[in-house]
């Protein structure tokens, strides 16, 4: 039996962390969560295969700053950004490998499978 690919979900809303966790797990991946609180986020020590990052973070820690922190900790893990926008926001584009509009779980799973492969 192989180990499932892990997806780290970063959001400031605990409800969104749970919802996206369910979607990720239903797709066959292991979900990890990191909640952004005002000006900090505690990233897990373990290796992750992909990072799912909410663009619309409240507080002092922006999605761009969070993406920079993610890059320094998980250099090889691609970042997939979630946003209410219709296209990827320009300021975060250099840090991420993909974009999914919020509210489309099927598209999210499709992008996860494209980026991680359907091995899980």
Predicted regions and their residues:
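As written
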Residues: 91-100, 104
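Conserved phosphotransfer cores of two-component systems
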Residues: 44-46, 69-76
């Amino acid at each position: 039996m192989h180990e499932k690919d892990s997806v780290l979900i970063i959001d400031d809303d605990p409800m969104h962390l749970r919802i996206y966790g369910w979607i990720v797990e239903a797709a066959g991946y292991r979900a990890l969560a990191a909640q952004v609180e005002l000006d900090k986020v505690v990233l897990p020590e373990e290796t992750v295969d992909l990072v799912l990052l909410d663009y619309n973070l409240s507080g002092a820690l922006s999605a761009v700053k969070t993406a920079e922190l993610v890059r320094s900790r998980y250099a090889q893990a691609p970042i997939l950004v979630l946003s209410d926008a219709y296209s990827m926001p320009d300021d975060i584009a250099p840090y991420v490998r993909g974009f999914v509009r919020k509210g489309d779980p099927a598209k999210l799973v499709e992008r996860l499978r494209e980026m991680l492969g359907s091995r899980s």
